Design a protein with these regions (language model features):
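Extracytosolic ligand-binding ectodomains
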Residues: 2-7, 15, 23, 48, ...
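Intrinsically disordered, low-complexity segments used as extracellular stalks/linkers
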Residues: 24-31, 35-36, 40-41, 45
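Bacterial N-terminal signal peptides that target proteins for export
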Residues: 45-56
């Protein structure tokens, strides 16, 4: 859009053409509500969304009033989505990911982008590449770039993500990480062309630790798996315990020796094994499990030697989303998703949804569909995105990690949302989750 055509979105109803202005209702007042028995006004988040649409409409009307501001064809903004096939290995069959896990979130977010983008003559579309185990991630990224995708949302492991990020520099491609939790991607291996929507393990561990400390469950027994990712989550939990004043009274490792857990004798074997693994531990308030590999943690609740709650990779689990979350207007998104895809919305779906919405917000509020200007706005202090979390989400400028509340889920209900009350920060309470600016090793390059 030429600079002379950019219209301020900070408009009021008085800026509308007379035809539209006549239909504007006057503001609610407490006296009207009380005396006339009128319904309560919409929630603040709903009103904010309506104001946002109104501003976009004002801009559109102003452009049309200038005469011929719209072209016949909208500006096409291609959003790439590069994903690897998810592992189907889960302890519980109900947790096996759907084939469109993540992709469904991308498509739903594109609908939301277009709901506002049409007022600015913008059209968003997702182009996708699914990687098999031996497929070349860099070649897939280049194929998406060849289709016009300057922003590519990724659901890749850390090693593949770094390969794509380094190769993407020559294509002026910006990646938005929606899956990898690895701290190193935001620290010593950070990249200036990678934005992170997926939380870090430290953010998840800190969110859990804050709640356990708030509950005064400060004596933890830590049981960790034998795989590399399990060790990384265990490190994050140990750091969180030290940071917030909990004490790990004992650490044990659960060796993954394989085995056929779904044989006819599997349930009986697990019932005998889990108490033995946890027997003889010092006095503790909670058993904290680090088992990203889905080997043992799901079997711990109700099977431990001592009657203790389980948290971490099972029991009370920190996550960015769950199908039961219904606060701050989230039920509307949950219902839309379930109606469209006939399944619950997962945390991965939500992370991809948020990534695609960030691109749409940058295009709508940044005043341009040009990728460089969109990226500059996304990295600016003015940028934020609403994601049904009760507050606007922003980027940490030192490592491009999205600040966000973390939900604590017990399998059926959202037990709490961190950061917890009383954990303060001089900039944002959200910065109590994960490594803070003084701790970072990131030098964006």
């Amino acid at each position: 859009m030429p600079a002379s055509r950019i219209i301020s979105l900070q408009a009021s109803p008085d800026d509308l053409p007379p035809m539209l202005r006549r239909n504007q209702r006057r503001p609610w007042s407490e006296q009207q509500t009380a005396e006339q028995g009128l319904p309560e006004p919409a929630a603040p988040e709903t009103l904010s969304w309506k104001r946002h649409l109104l501003r976009l409409l004002v801009a559109a009307c102003a452009l049309m009033a200038e005469g011929g501001a719209w072209s016949d064809q909208p500006q096409e903004i291609k959003i790439g989505y590069l994903r690897q096939a998810p592992s189907k290995i889960r302890i519980s069959l109900i947790d096996v990911p759907a084939g469109n896990d993540g992709l469904a979130g991308a498509h739903l977010a594109t609908e939301d982008d277009n709901a506002t983008g049409r007022f600015l003559n913008q059209h968003y579309a997702v182009v996708e590449k699914l990687l098999g185990e031996g497929d070349d991630a860099v070649a897939a990224m280049n194929a998406l770039a060849d289709q016009g995708a300057s922003f590519i949302v990724t659901s890749l492991d850390a090693d593949r993500l770094l390969q794509v990020a380094d190769a993407g520099r020559t294509r002026s491609v910006t990646l938005i990480n929606a899956l990898a939790l690895d701290e190193r991607l935001r620290e010593q291996d950070c990249r200036a062309n990678v934005i992170h929507v997926a939380p870090t393990r430290a953010m998840l561990a800190d969110a859990l630790a804050q709640y356990l400390v708030w509950k005064k469950w400060t004596k933890w027994m830590l049981l960790t798996g034998s795989h590399d990712n399990d060790a990384l989550f265990a490190d994050a939990l140990r750091h969180a315990a030290t940071r917030f004043g909990a004490k790990i009274v004992e650490q044990r490792e659960f060796k993954d020796n394989g085995g056929a857990r779904r044989t006819d004798s599997g349930v009986a074997e697990i019932q005998r094994q889990m108490p033995v693994v946890t027997q003889g531990a010092p006095e503790h308030d909670v058993l904290v499990a680090a088992d990203e590999s889905e080997v043992f943690a799901g079997y711990l609740p109700y099977r431990t030697w001592d009657a203790r709650p389980v948290a971490g990779s099972a029991g009370l689990v920190p996550t960015t989303w769950n199908a039961a979350f219904d606060q701050w207007g989230a039920v509307q998104l949950q219902n839309r998703f379930t109606k469209a895809y006939q399944r619950p919305m997962t945390a991965h779906d939500m992370q991809v949804w948020t990534a695609v919405r960030m691109i749409g917000e940058a295009g709508a509020r940044g005043g341009s569909a040009e990728p460089g200007k969109m990226l500059a706005y996304m990295k600016s202090p003015e940028f934020s995105v609403a994601a049904f979390k009760g507050q606007k989400l922003t980027l940490r400028d030192w490592n491009l990690q999205l600040r966000q509340p973390i939900l604590l889920f017990d399998g059926r209900n959202t037990v709490s949302v961190s950061p917890q009350e009383g954990f303060l920060h001089q900039v944002s309470a959200l910065d109590t989750l994960g490594l803070d600016r003084p701790e970072t090793k990131c030098r964006l390059k």
